[in-house]
Amino acid sequence: MVNFTVDQIRAIMDKKANIRNMSVIAHVDHGKSTLTDSLVCKAGIIASARAGETRFTDTRKDEQERCITIKSTAISLFYELSENDLNFIKQSKDGSGFLINLIDSPGHVDFSSEVTAALRVTDGALVVVDCVSGVCVQTETVLRQAIAERIKPVLMMNKMDRALLELQLEPEELYQTFQRIVENVNVIISTYGEGESGPMGNIMIDPVLGTVGFGSGLHGWAFTLKQFAEMYVAKFAAKGEGQLSAAERAKKVEDMMKKLWGDRYFDPANGKFSKSANSPDGKKLPRTFCQLILDPIFKVFDAIMNFRKEETAKLIEKLDIKLDSEDKDKEGKPLLKAVMRRWLPAGDALLQMITIHLPSPVTAQKYRCELLYEGPPDDEAAMGIKSCDPKGPLMMYISKMVPTSDKGRFYAFGRVFSGVVSTGLKVRIMGPNYTPGKKEDLYLKPIQRTILMMGRYVEPIEDVPCGNIVGLVGVDQFLVKTGTITTFEHAHNMRVMKFSVSPVVRVAVEAKNPADLPKLVEGLKRLAKSDPMVQCIIEESGEHIIAGAGELHLEICLKDLEEDHACIPIKKSDPVVSYRETVSEESNVLCLSKSPNKHNRLYMKARPFPDGLAEDIDKGEVSARQELKARARYLAEKYEWDVAEARKIWCFGPDGTGPNILTDITKGVQYLNEIKDSVVAGFQWATKEGALCEENMRGVRFDVHDVTLHADAIHRGGGQIIPTARRCLYASVLTAQPRLMEPIYLVEIQCPEQVVGGIYGVLNRKRGHVFEESQVAGTPMFVVKAYLPVNESFGFTADLRSNTGGQAFPQCVFDHWQILPGDPFDNSSRPSQVVAETRKRKGLKEGIPALDNFLDKL
């Protein structure tokens, strides 16, 4: 079954220059899993006849049934490059065998957290684009994430069989399509990348360099310009050139590749390349890419699909393709598959592109270290990561948990960045909240076993050196979702992953049979472990809430909960959307609150953030961990804050990182530092449960204007200050025109021209609005982009399909928060209904609490 053993893999793991860690990323249904099959079959794990149909990496039953990838799966492949190909590799290498750790990731936007987890442990990405529908919204999202993590992309144009058989494009049109996709991808790379002067150098993709592949995953064939350049170099070589050395030959092939793309033309009359589109006698010349590459492919397709036997036989002989006896009797599509697969095998083309152009851990960790590691850039751990040193201290990042066949236990899945991880090694397990020098979120435990992940199987392995991807057994009890594993006692954490979506849709769950409650609680804990994104919360009313990224994500989570994690029947509520509370202008009075013993007074005001600041905090451009002066400068330059105020930010909230700020603009208050912690605690409490309906606050800046304190320390303890601070914060919100914010999806809808009207109808009913509409060049498809409130998105897909005759395909991504128009105090408005519903659901008193509860008189 497998052509190579664990021992062989283990031997090659030490050659860190010959390891490639890569993930396959793309828009939903552009053919990632199908393509991965051709790679897997090349490495001899599935029979080549079944490649393209097996979807080996879709390991779960529901993935096979729905034909979508839900969880990212990892697989290790072994590939050997020939002498000639080794000369194309520009980085250091060690022997001709390569170990490729491949992670197939989901394309569905609801699972984009899985993609983030996959990207963290890889250095390169194969971006798959369907050449018929082009670069879509999800392609852009995942590519942006990859570039933010400093991951080098190579491109694969998939589904060429559709372009040839369904759309029947001419060679020149097809070239233009490819050219446009390459341009689109490069625009994304240059927008989010660091430019040529950055640490990675130029990461733009270019067919001439061989970083773009073309082909069809379903039929199992693919090529880069390198394959054709080699054929033509061999064909045009004069008699005396047969003795070229490998290096000279590589040079010739690279020169040839430059002539095969772009505005270069070929004159068939004399076999010369020219740079002008017209020959000397005025004939229009064909483009080299069309004449020398697409033309032979078109001829093969044409001859076989029109059942011209003699012509087919001639072509097969000319292209020197050896068919099996059983393949010779086929005709039509099956024969086409067999011929193309023999002539341009996808596995070879892609694996060569991966080994030649994607970086090894040695290359990549040099420039990725500063993004990965939170600690100082010159301590032992950082040096170990930078040089990918097996003798350095162990540094390993766990990016997700993978459920095992044993109920309730998980493998910790991650990558070793420095040192060696081995069975029985005693390590420090550090969760995301660990800070060096403290004891919380830290465990000292031995690793029970190290294992190798092979898609549906796991293989035990003694030890794994740095640069590799590995699973650990026996760590799952100490980590929730992610964490750092190390042997270096002064190590800082590896940086937490930033998710591009946020969990905004929630359902309440309860056990159908109340006696099953303990099982439900246990199941929720396991669910929180197994999915990087999902949040499980217990409300004060005792309700169990699951929050996810969208309908599909929640559906899968609930199914997992019912069948795998809790194994009990479950009742679920309708999905509800979480809101945020904010203010729309500055407080109209200076708010005063007195402490319960009447000896301390706080004076505060609230005001809204300038546009864009809340988003900056979400992205981490502005954060609590930043250096103080740098942060003050940024706020002063970009948002015109007063520098003195910007330096006196006490904290961010909720949870110390959220998009609300508490600043101290008092002048000369005695004992202020003693109550700082208490005020901050009150602020965290108030921003987590706002005044309107106990939802999180967002985009509010609170200013402490003045504080009068009792001279005796005993009269100004936490019990006096914390509730006072909270009351004062609530008062300042209620006097500053409070508003509700709702989450908004960005919807991208692909559809034929004639049903665009139906889409507008559905969106208008759902309070959505279209902000961009464009035609995909060269196809009759339209792309409509619109904003749609998450609250209205339930059943949107079904509604859309029924109004467009099933021809429109929506993709929803959480995009931003937007203020719900209307005043929550006006009983007829939309926000006041939402507040009433939310308060009722949470079991709070009816109606927004009156201002008198919080505001005191002098």
UniProtKB/Swiss-Prot annotation:
In-chain residues carrying the UniProt-annotated modification Phosphoserine: S325, S502, S595
Family annotation (Pfam families): EFG_C, EFG_III, EFG_IV, GTP_EFTU, GTP_EFTU_D2
Source organism of the structure: Mus musculus
InterPro entries per UniProt: EFG_II, EFG_III/V, EFG_V-like, EFTu-like_2, G_TR_CS, P-loop_NTPase, Ribosomal_Su5_D2-typ_SF, Ribsml_uS5_D2-typ_fold_subgr
Keyword check for Endoplasmic reticulum: no
Phosphotyrosine modified-residue sites: Y265, Y373
Modified residues (Diphthamide): H715
GO-annotated molecular function: 5S rRNA binding; actin filament binding; GTP binding; GTPase activity; lncRNA binding; p53 binding; protein kinase binding; ribosome binding
Matches recorded under NCBIfam families: small_GTP
Role description: Catalyzes the GTP-dependent ribosomal translocation step during translation elongation. During this step, the ribosome changes from the pre-translocational (PRE) to the post-translocational (POST) state as the newly formed A-site-bound peptidyl-tRNA and P-site-bound deacylated tRNA move to the P and E sites, respectively. Catalyzes the coordinated movement of the two tRNA molecules, the mRNA and conformational changes in the ribosome.
UniProt subunit comment: Binds to 80S ribosomes. Actively translating ribosomes show mutually exclusive binding of eIF5a (EIF5A or EIF5A2) and EEF2/eEF2. Interacts with SERBP1; interaction sequesters EEF2/eEF2 at the A-site of the ribosome, thereby blocking the interaction sites of the mRNA-tRNA complex, promoting ribosome stabilization and hibernation. Interacts with HABP4; interaction takes place at the A-site of hibernating ribosomes and promotes ribosome stabilization. Component of the mRNA surveillance SURF complex, at least composed of ERF1, ERF3 (ERF3A or ERF3B), EEF2, UPF1/RENT1, SMG1, SMG8 and SMG9.
GO biological process, one term: response to endoplasmic reticulum stress
Residues found modified as N6-succinyllysine: K152, K272, K572
Source domain of life: Eukaryota
N6-acetyllysine: residues bearing it: K235, K239, K272, K275, K439, K445, K619
Modified how: Phosphorylation by EF-2 kinase completely inactivates EF-2; it requires prior phosphorylation by CDK2 at Ser-595 during mitotic prometaphase. Phosphorylation by CSK promotes SUMOylation, proteolytic cleavage, and nuclear translocation if the C-terminal fragment.
Name the record gives this protein: Elongation factor 2
Family: Belongs to the TRAFAC class translation factor GTPase superfamily. Classic translation factor GTPase family. EF-G/EF-2 subfamily.
Record keywords: Acetylation, Cytoplasm, Elongation factor, GTP-binding, Hydrolase, Isopeptide bond, Methylation, Nucleotide-binding, Nucleus, Phosphoprotein, Protein biosynthesis, Ubl conjugation
EC number: 3.6.5.-
Keyword Hydrolase attributed: yes
Domain annotation tr-type G: ranges: 17-362
Top enzyme class: hydrolase
